C-alpha cells in the first residue's frame, strides 16, 4: 500500500462544512437525516445572532461524502496529494455531532454523510485521481450515547461507571518525569466532554476492539494511512500494541498521532526512536505543534538577527536533534482545533505573511498539511464552540455567492492567495522538485540583516529559499552563501524569471526568492 510521507501535501477538511453533494435531491437528503438524534441541518444560519449563532455552532450544515467526491478535481488541480477528512463514523448525539469525534457506532458511516459504499467510492475515486486518503480515528473515548457505554455489559470497558472524571487536558502528563500518578491517571481516564465516555485503555478487550476496528476500516476503505486523535491521552502501552497490530497487517503504512503540545520535548516523546523517551513508542509520525506556535506569531514580527521573526524559525529548526525523525513531523499553519493562520479578514490584507509561511511549510522538513480554506484566505479564531475556524467552504452549499471550486466571485485578495498556493503546490509536486524537498538534506544559514537563507540538496541538485523578514529593502553579499548558490544564475520559481547571481543580491521588503538550480 502506498502511504503518505514527506513527498505529500495533506489537505484537512471537515466533511460537514466542505460541500453538500445531495442538496439537489431534497427527499434523499431528508432520508439521510431521518431517525437521527440531531436531524436538523442548515448551512445558512446567521451566526451573528444569539439564537442562530448557537444553532450554527451545534448543528450540521449538510456537507457529505457526495460533496467530497464531487470536488476531488478541485484538490487535484490545487496540487495537494492527500486528503484527510475528520471522522466519518456515526455520531448520533443530541447536539454538536458534526465534527465526528464522539462516535456512537464504530462500524457505521454516519448516514448524514452517506454510506460505507459512498466512503469506499470516495477513496476509490481519490486513488484514480492520484490522491491518497487518511482515515481519522478516535480510540480514547466514545460518545456517552453509544451503545458501548449506555448498554455496557462490562463496566470494566470504561474508566468509570459515572462520568464524574473529566480529563485535566494536560497531554504532557505522561512524559513529565516528576508528575504525580494522580495527574497522569486523570489525563488518561477522564472524558473530554459531558457527551463522551473514556475507554479503559488498559483493558485487553478494549484494546482488541479498537485494533480490530482500525484494521476493518483500512481493509474496507483502502485508506492510505491513519491519523489518531488525542494520542497522548491514551495509555502508552495500549497504543504501542495498536500501532504494532496495524504495522503487522499493513507494513509501511504511516500513522500520525495528534500531539497537541507546545513543548518539542513532549512532542518528541511520542515519536518512534525518540531520544528523550524513557520507553519506546511505536508511533511513526507526530504533529509539529511547536512549529505552528512559532509560525502563528513570528511572521507578524520584524526579524532581527538574534531573537525575533524568522530567527525564531531558524533556531527552532536548529534544535531538530530533539526529534528522532524530523522528516516525519506533520507541519501545518492551521487546523480545526486552533485559530486559522489568518485570524481576521483585516489581518489577511498582509498576503506576504501567508506567502512566507506557506513557502516555509512547503520547503522545510516534514509532511505539510493545509486546512480547508487556507488557500482562499478563510479567517477565524477558535472560540468556545470552535465556530470561528470551522465555517463553510465557499461554494459548497446552495446560495453561496462565492464559489472557490469554480473560482467565481472571489475577491482580489482571495484570488491572490489561491493562485500563489496553487503555484507552489504544483511546483512542489513536480517529480524532480518533489524528491529534492522530500529526501534532500537541509542546510541553513543564520539570519543576517533579517534575511533567512536555506536550501535542500539531493544528488548535487539544489533548491534555495531566501526570505526577507523585515519591512525594509536589503542588499546582501552573496559570497557567504556560496554553498547554497552553486551557479551564477537560477530560475526564481514565483516569478518564473532567471536571476543572475552577482556579488550582491537585493531583496525588497518581505520578499521571497525560491531559486531552482536544477
Model-derived regions, located:
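Soluble or luminal CAZymes and related metallo-dependent hydrolases
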Residues: 60-67, 114-118, 205-210, 234, ...
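Short, flexible loop/turn elements at secondary-structure junctions
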Residues: 14-17, 89, 107-113, 139-141, ...
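Solvent-exposed beta-hairpin/edge-strand motifs
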Residues: 480-496
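Loop/helix patches that line or flank the sugar-binding groove of alpha-linked glycan CAZymes
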Residues: 3-6, 21-56, 60, 261, ...
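Active-site-proximal helices and loops of the catalytic beta/alpha 8
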Residues: 123-131, 141, 146-149, 213-215, ...
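C-terminal beta-strand-rich structural cap/linker in extracellular carbohydrate-active enzymes
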Residues: 9, 501-518
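Hydrophobic faces of well-ordered beta-strands that scaffold small-molecule active sites
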Residues: 9-11, 83-85, 133-135, 226, ...
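Substrate-binding/active-site clefts of carbohydrate-active enzymes
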Residues: 2-9, 14-221, 239-250, 265-266, ...
Amino acid at each position: 500500500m502506498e502511504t503518505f510521507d514527506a513527498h505529500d501535501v495533506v489537505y484537512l477538511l471537515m466533511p460537514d462544512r466542505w460541500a453538500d453533494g445531495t442538496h439537489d435531491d431534497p427527499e434523499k437528503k431528508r432520508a439521510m437525516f431521518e431517525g437521527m438524534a440531531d436531524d436538523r441541518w442548515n448551512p445558512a444560519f446567521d451566526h451573528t445572532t444569539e439564537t442562530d449563532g448557537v444553532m450554527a455552532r451545534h448543528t450540521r450544515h449538510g456537507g457529505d461524502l457526495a460533496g467530497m467526491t464531487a470536488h476531488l478535481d478541485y484538490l487535484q488541480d490545487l496540487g495537494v496529494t492527500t486528503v484527510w477528512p475528520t471522522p466519518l463514523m456515526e455520531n448520533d448525539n443530541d447536539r454538536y455531532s458534526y465534527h465526528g469525534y464522539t462516535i456512537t457506532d464504530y462500524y457505521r458511516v454516519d448516514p448524514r454523510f452517506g454510506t460505507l459504499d459512498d466512503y469506499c467510492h470516495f477513496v476509490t475515486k481519490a486513488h484514480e485521481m492520484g490522491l491518497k486518503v487518511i482515515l481519522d480515528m478516535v480510540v480514547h473515548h466514545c460518545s456517552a450515547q453509544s451503545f458501548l457505554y449506555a448498554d455496557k455489559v462490562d463496566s470494566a470497558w470504561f474508566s468509570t461507571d459515572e462520568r464524574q472524571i473529566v480529563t485535566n487536558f494536560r497531554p504532557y502528563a505522561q512524559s513529565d518525569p516528576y508528575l504525580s500518578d494522580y495527574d497522569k491517571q486523570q489525563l488518561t481516564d477522564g472524558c473530554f466532554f459531558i457527551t463522551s465516555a473514556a475507554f479503559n485503555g488498559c483493558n485487553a478487550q478494549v484494546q482488541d476492539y479498537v485494533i480490530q476496528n482500525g484494521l476493518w476500516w483500512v481493509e474496507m476503505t483502502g485508506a492510505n494511512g491513519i491519523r489518531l486523535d488525542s494520542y497522548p491521552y491514551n495509555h502508552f502501552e495500549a497504543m504501542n500494541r495498536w500501532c504494532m497490530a496495524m504495522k503487522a497487517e499493513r507494513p509501511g503504512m504511516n500513522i500520525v498521532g495528534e500531539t497537541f503540545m507546545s513543548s518539542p520535548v513532549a512532542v518528541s516523546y511520542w515519536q518512534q526512536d525518540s531520544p528523550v523517551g524513557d520507553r519506546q513508542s511505536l508511533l511513526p509520525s507526530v504533529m509539529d505543534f511547536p512549529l505552528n506556535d512559532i509560525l502563528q506569531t513570528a511572521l507578524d514580527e520584524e526579524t532581527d538577527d538574534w531573537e525575533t521573526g524568522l530567527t525564531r524559525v531558524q533556531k527552532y529548526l536548529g534544535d531538530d536533534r530533539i526529534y528522532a525523525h524530523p522528516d516525519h513531523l506533520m507541519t501545518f499553519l492551521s487546523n480545526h482545533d486552533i485559530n486559522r493562520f489568518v485570524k481576521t479578514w483585516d489581518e489577511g490584507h498582509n498576503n506576504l505573511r501567508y506567502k512566507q509561511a506557506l513557502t516555509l511549510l512547503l520547503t522545510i522538513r516534514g509532511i505539510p498539511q493545509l486546512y480547508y480554506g487556507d488557500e482562499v484566505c478563510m479567517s477565524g479564531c477558535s472560540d468556545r464552540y470552535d465556530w470561528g475556524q470551522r465555517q463553510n467552504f465557499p461554494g459548497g452549499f446552495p446560495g453561496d455567492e462565492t464559489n472557490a471550486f469554480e473560482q467565481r466571485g472571489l475577491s482580489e485578495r482571495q484570488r491572490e492567495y489561491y493562485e500563489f498556493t496553487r503555484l507552489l503546490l504544483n511546483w512542489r509536486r513536480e517529480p524532480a522538485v518533489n524528491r529534492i524537498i522530500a529526501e534532500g538534506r537541509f542546510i541553513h544559514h543564520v539570519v543576517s540583516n533579517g534575511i533567512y537563507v536555506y536550501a535542500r540538496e539531493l544528488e548535487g541538485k539544489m533548491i534555495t529559499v531566501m526570505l526577507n523578514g523585515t519591512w525594509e529593502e536589503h542588499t546582501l553579499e552573496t559570497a557567504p552563501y556560496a554553498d547554497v548558490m552553486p551557479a551564477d544564475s537560477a530560475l526564481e520559481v514565483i516569478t518564473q524569471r532567471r536571476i543572475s547571481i552577482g556579488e550582491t543580491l537585493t531583496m525588497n521588503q518581505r520578499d521571497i526568492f525560491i531559486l531552482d538550480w536544477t
